[in-house]
Amino acid sequence: MEVIEKLETIRETLNDTKDKKDFQKIHDELVQYLDGVDSLTIDDDKWNEILKLFKTIIIKLKSSTIKTTPLENELLQHEKKRTVKEVEKVEEDIKTDVTNDTSKPTLMDKVLQVSNQPNNPYSADVLQIRTILSKTLFVDTDSEAYSLYVPESQKLDVSPITIELTTIEKYQPKVNILKQAVIVPSQNPLLADTYGAPEILFSTDFFDDITSNSSEGLQLYFFDKAYKLKKELPNLPFLSSLDKDVNPLNPLNSVCKSFGQEKYYDMVMDRTDRGLDARRAAMQFDNVIVDAQNRTVQFNVRMHPFDLQLLRISQQFAEPMQDLAPVVREYMMLGADGYVLTQKIRLDRDQQLIANRRSVVFDRMCELSGPLYRSRIIHSMRMMSKLWRTNVFRTSLEDEITKIYAAAEVSMISIDATTSALSTINIASAEQTLNALLNMSFFRCELDLIGSQSSFGAAMSAMIALMILPTDQENMDDEVFDVLCNLVYNELIAWAADRPVFVRRAGATNAFRQFVNAGLNRDITNYMRFVLLRRPWLPLYNSRDVRRNAHVLVPNVDLANINDQVYVAINSFLNGIIEASRRNPNPNKTISANSFRKLMKNMRDICVNRLMPVIRLIRYNVERIGMILHMLPYSADIFDINRNLRDERLRIKIPMSGFLSLVMGITKAPDAFDWSQILNFADDVRKMDYAEAISIEDSASVAIMRNDANRATSKKEIFISEVRPPTPTVASIQKIPSATLTAIFSDRQLINLIRDTHSFRVIREIAVALQAAFDNSPTSQHGVGKGAVLHPVPQNFGRSSQFVRRDNILLQRPAGIQQFTIEDLKQGRYFQGLMAQIRARQPIIVNGPIPLRISDAAEIEQVTLAFLTMNSPYDAYIDPRDLKQQKLLTDREVDLFIDQSPARPNDEFDNVMARTSVFIIDAPRAIVPINPQRLNFPYHDIMVTDSVTKFIEFTVALTPDLQLFNGLLVFEQ
């Protein structure tokens, strides 16, 4: 291709070139050539080849000290064009697909539909300004890169949080059934054995994985299997449907085909099998009874006790619910502020809502880990940022500042330091400060002052900040308080009153404390004394749980009374500055005397008159969001929980000039609160809390249980491997350093909270049911026995059940034989007693889960090996290395031999496997009962929801002027 050939030629020319002028000439020619090339028509493969050549050329030019910025910019432009072209192509393909489906409106139809409406969503966000994570907190607005600040407007989705609700009829039985014939052994050696009447048995397939997964211990296997079973269990305690059919033996009755009962009925209805007559007789009385009045259903099932136990666990430990009707009424009362809320439909008496499931385990983990706490607080702030109504600013303050300069008779022709007095005042600072103040009402934070601290505007802003901010020691650090006081003193008081500038030193860090009794103007002294009171904010709403949400605080400033202490203090302070500057020929280091006095008078009017709208705006937002305080995301103050952890608080950056910018910037009333959005937000938080609680508590419960069973296992590693993060906050747990996470999971209070969770109780109950199922089910065919009896001399084979010819299984432990447990022998306990029994050639019983070596009766090699090991049990079970260590080093396998096929006359294996000295202890096979178990469950539709707002209809009823509850306008011009 022409472009590739051209670039290869240039690369070869560069290798031969040595003069810098020639390099520059080649660079300029290449830029000019690239400008005329249409890169959109180039294939992807060739474009990649071109990029490689360009990189080689650019590296060569840079090594020759040639500035390659124009060439790189040109190449970047071509890449952007190609990207845009690809996006357009994809969108065009999507449009083509949509157009093919005529039933769906196209994107153009939607655009045309809303084009005439005043609020067009397709043109509202035309201006897209680059946003960064949590810029409300951390953007330095004094830097040029972010001089224009636009808050995030996109909705924070709490998807993909989906709550799956399953009713009891979705339960799949874990124990299958099978039909097996009885073996009738022949008493005559010349006659073969025969099959007798069949019987229906419970299988033990659910223990198929016990050999492969129980290598670390049977208890760990139970916990892992219980954790998997918990995820499969239904989480609603009722039935919504039932698979029924006519009883074939009694047309007046019905039978239940759910819960695996259809397979049983198919087996029983084999009328050629006369051995099942008793079961068919009992089946006539099976029936399903539905009580529509009480909404219950009764039906008959024949299930394994393990399945019945799991059903009881799923019903007893179903997900906690709450009645929907009271919550709907609460939502309707909340939304009565400017809205009329009505129910869309009449609610059923069984209509339920997922209960607020707030994880105390997660709260405790946040208390133990500072990074996790801050991550969760930032996530909550970002979620709440879209609720504030802060659209109250003009586009720019330049005109306002120009008017102030003109009124102060500051000449704009001679640019000097005077014009920089208010240079840091801008809308970006106002936005950031307002968001910080609103966040400080709900979250306790530490302040981090940024920006210039040596200008007139910053000093005026600090003077207002000392009135608005909470200056008590619990909410404001002494360092921040000293910085604000010193700035006000040095930039406003010291020059105006002709006093020496304050310099910090040991023992004297605060200018106000140093000079409050130094004979200053009375008005100035009153302000300083008022500031030194260090007044806190007022509590507006008290939290129900300080470990979940902090109290809601608001500035301690009156909304209506202009004679409130704060307004009077600011007014008298500025009057005192003006009065002091009258006697001083040089009242400011950078502003002339006349200009300074006029500037101060303008500032007095602005600060005193426009501070009240700021307070009203803050109260307007906080009052409404504070109403749903108990529905808000996590906002606890770690200082309330542990006084030693104040340093773990989040640090909010506030521009030093932000308060004056805020006072000057508010020009209009805020938008009305959208209660539909706020209540939808409450629903989203409920779902998020539920998903976080399930994720954290499930994985933490498994970690604690596995550690209880085996102290060598790491709780931290199990937790990280099992957790499935639904939110970024839970995902941040995986970023905690390893040693820190280990220390967190060593906290006794956290472990006790985990043991008290719903997840822990469910998993423990399932594990107990699994243990009982193991103890009472035959598991020898799956490779694990309950124990073994070792005889010194071979004994005759037995017959443990009527379904086998012979086997070496015992269903009961023989009496009068010394017993040992595997765990004791592994620890070295009673090992000498075991050796004494062997030396005395006495039989022994080894209790505990024992791995088995299963021999197939049809293979001569396996039978021969089994004959050798089963007739020398001591040599096979005790290893010489065990004698040296005086303990059992590993679990030893013992032989299991089952012959369950009818034998021909004169079977050759009878002579080989005639006797054995090894017997396996196991449970008997479970027969499906003839008479059924009768179950009774609630029976109604799935009336459980995770959203309240979808049952509510919103009607706007706004007054002409936006008002507070006490009837005061937010802003009066």
UniProtKB/Swiss-Prot annotation:
It comes from the Viruses. InterPro entries: Rotavirus_VP2. Keywords: Capsid protein, Inner capsid protein, RNA-binding, T=2 icosahedral capsid protein, Virion. It is found in: Virion. GO terms for cellular component: T=2 icosahedral viral capsid; viral inner capsid; viral nucleocapsid. One of its GO terms (molecular function) is RNA binding. The keyword Secreted does not apply. Inner capsid protein that self-assembles to form an icosahedral capsid with a T=2 symmetry, which consists of 120 copies of VP2, with channels at each of its five-fold vertices. This capsid constitutes the innermost concentric layer of the viral mature particle. It encapsidates the polymerase VP1, the capping enzyme VP3 and the genomic dsRNA, thereby defining the core. Homodecamer; each decamer is made up of two conformers of VP2, called VP2A and VP2B. Interacts with a VP1-VP3 complex. Interacts with the intermediate capsid protein VP6. Interacts with NSP5. Interacts (via N-terminus) with NSP2. Belongs to the rotavirus VP2 family. This is Inner capsid protein VP2. It comes from Rotavirus X (isolate RVX/Human/Bangladesh/NADRV-B219/2002/GXP[X]) (RV ADRV-N). The lineage of its organism: Viruses, Riboviria, Orthornavirae, Duplornaviricota, Resentoviricetes.
